[in-house]
């Protein structure tokens, strides 16, 4: 991961804000410890902290067009950059081997028509440009010649981005809110699948974020009669994983032992021996794939992860942490992940500890299994879905909010140590295949027997299990969903609930809305995390940047209507789903 800071609509001399931009950028240097760069000119400033993964030698940022009239700062990966480079061969003189430079080529093609000189770029043109990108990204582009800017974020929000405003009306964007805290009067998340385009001197008090990412599968009626194919799911995910192995540095996989990470790891192992950039003509820098698991000793995930690693042939690393080590890290974890959401803090802590070990081994990028539960209804509360329509609409809602939760966790807990996380299940092309699959085929369905010969009535993500059963040990292919924060060890969650219930008094909870009028904590654990968050980020904007809603087993609030028992609960653990989880409480 990299980190970016952009400043637009500058009223004073641009150079007067240069030192401020550098200080802001330094706050997110953990995201990109390899190099720093800054552009200061026109009515904009762009700063960049680089984590070099593609083209380490010449891919420093900000990036410039050949005539240096356009400048770009990007946090992201463009997986189809070679295809775009071929398309613009002879039309655009690429300056580096960076995958992100193709964004400049695409933008330049929109402004180079002499007959349209001086005209604004149209919404349709920008949508076409952004839709042509296959990857994860948040970028800020400034056109010095036209005094225009273009800011955009990837469709699902895998890469974080925030936008803020100071009292002078200056506009700021940054990869993390810690760069904006104390600098802006107000700020908010820049919405996934949106862009902002305008003059360097913004006329309104707030950027207009415009949606470019639209899909027919947002609507149940568009998919309800579609076919369902496990083979199509298999082929599309294999293509996604292969695309995302683009790297000029050693990489690995996060392997929890659950279905999703096991599938990603198994596919990655098949391609890891050779470099995908030249169609497997040369061997990879690190031909044997390394896998990583984290948990308390004896945790459910660890034994399963080892089983998968032995089956697929990775070099496996099991990282143990103690409850005390986890507790000691929570204050730092909340600073880096910038949320007080209970599930996210629970799950980010072991991931944060794991990332430190991964970085110490010289690995800069890992693949992870985030997104599958949202796409295929993998959370255990989906067993209660009353209809295919309710099921599908909940998956769409979950995807629309993923940037507040799992995307945030996977990105920021890894980026805290300069490690990039890639998520093949959230690949744009794979999403179209998976979300257009008939929802009936994705609902929790019956199985005749379990691997132990015991009867099982329903299981989640059946179509994914069918698609990849031949690549995994049988007991993994048909293993019940275990949320990451549970799977690292049940005692981790139980201890957090106990300690926070003792640390926060009943009186404090009774007055929670007075201390925290924005998103008042719903329970003592959230109150505990919120208190730490407020020490790091005291502004109202920071508090509003976190999404809050009642939830059972990671459900949205709407899905609480599916089961009468859900209505009086607020517990994000999968063990809260009685009659479904094997160890429900």
What are the language-model segments listed below?
Residues 1, 204, 360-367, 386-387, ...:
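Adenosyl-5′-phosphate
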Residues 17, 96-99, 133, 226-233, ...:
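Hydrophobic (often cysteine-bearing) scaffold residues that line and stabilize catalytic clefts
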């Amino acid at each position: 991961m990299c980190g970016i800071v952009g400043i637009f609509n500058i009223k004073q001399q641009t150079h007067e804000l240069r030192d401020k931009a550098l200080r802001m950028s330094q706050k997110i240097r953990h995201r990109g410890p390899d190099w720093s760069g800054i552009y200061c000119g026109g009515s904009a400033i762009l700063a960049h902290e680089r984590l070099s993964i593609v083209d380490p030698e010449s891919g420093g940022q900000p990036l410039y067009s050949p005539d240096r009239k356009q400048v770009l700062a990007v946090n992201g990966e463009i997986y189809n950059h070679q295809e775009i480079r071929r398309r613009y061969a002879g039309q655009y003189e690429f300056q580096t081997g960076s995958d992100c430079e193709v964004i400049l080529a695409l933008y330049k093609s929109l402004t180079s028509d002499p007959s349209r000189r001086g005209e604004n770029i149209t919404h349709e043109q920008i949508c076409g440009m952004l839709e042509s990108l296959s990857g994860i990204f948040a970028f800020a582009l400034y056109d010095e010649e036209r005094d225009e800017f273009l800011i955009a974020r990837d469709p699902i929000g895998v890469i974080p981005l925030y936008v803020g405003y100071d009292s002078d009306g200056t506009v700021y964007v940054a990869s993390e809110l810690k760069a904006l805290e104390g600098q802006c009067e107000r700020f908010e998340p820049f919405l996934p699948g949106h862009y902002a385009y305008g003059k360097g001197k913004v006329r309104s008090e707030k950027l207009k974020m415009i949606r470019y990412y639209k899909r027919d599968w947002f609507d149940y009626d568009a998919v309800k009669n579609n076919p369902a194919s496990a083979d199509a799911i298999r082929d599309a995910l294999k293509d996604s994983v292969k695309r995302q192995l683009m790297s000029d540095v050693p990489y690995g996989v996060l392997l929890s032992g659950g279905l999703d990470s096991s599938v990603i790891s198994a596919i990655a192992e098949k391609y890891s021996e050779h470099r995908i950039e030249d169609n497997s003509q040369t061997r990879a820098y690190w031909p044997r794939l390394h896998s990583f698991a984290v948990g308390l000793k004896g945790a459910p995930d660890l034994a399963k992860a080892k089983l998968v690693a032995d089956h697929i042939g990775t070099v496996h690393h099991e990282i143990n942490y103690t409850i005390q080590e986890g507790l000691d890290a929570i204050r730092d974890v909340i600073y880096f992940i910038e949320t007080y959401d209970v599930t996210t803090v629970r799950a980010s802590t072991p991931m944060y500890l794991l990332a430190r070990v991964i970085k110490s081994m010289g690995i800069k990028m890992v693949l992870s299994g985030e997104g599958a539960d949202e796409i295929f209804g993998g959370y255990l509360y989906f067993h209660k879905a009353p209809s295919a329509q309710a099921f599908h609409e909940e998956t769409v809602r979950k995807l629309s909010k993923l940037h507040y939760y799992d995307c945030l966790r996977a990105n920021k807990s890894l980026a805290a140590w300069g490690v990039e996380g890639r998520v093949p299940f959230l690949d744009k092309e794979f999403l179209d295949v998976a979300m257009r699959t008939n929802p009936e085929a994705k609902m929790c369905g019956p199985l005749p027997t379990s691997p132990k010969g015991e009867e099982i009535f329903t299981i989640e993500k059946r179509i994914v299990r069918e698609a990849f059963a031949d690549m995994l040990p049988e007991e993994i292919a048909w293993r019940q969903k275990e949320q990451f924060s549970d799977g690292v060890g049940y005692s981790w969650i139980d201890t957090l609930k106990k300690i926070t219930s003792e640390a926060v008094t009943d009186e404090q909870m009774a007055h929670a809305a007075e201390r925290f009028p924005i998103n008042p904590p719903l329970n003592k654990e959230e109150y505990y995390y919120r208190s730490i968050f407020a020490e790091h980020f005291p502004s109202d904007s920071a508090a509003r940047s976190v999404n809050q809603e009642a939830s059972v087993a990671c459900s949205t609030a709407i899905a609480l209507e599916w089961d009468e028992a859900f209505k009086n609960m607020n517990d994000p653990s999968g063990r809260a789903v009685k009659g479904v989880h094997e160890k429900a409480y």
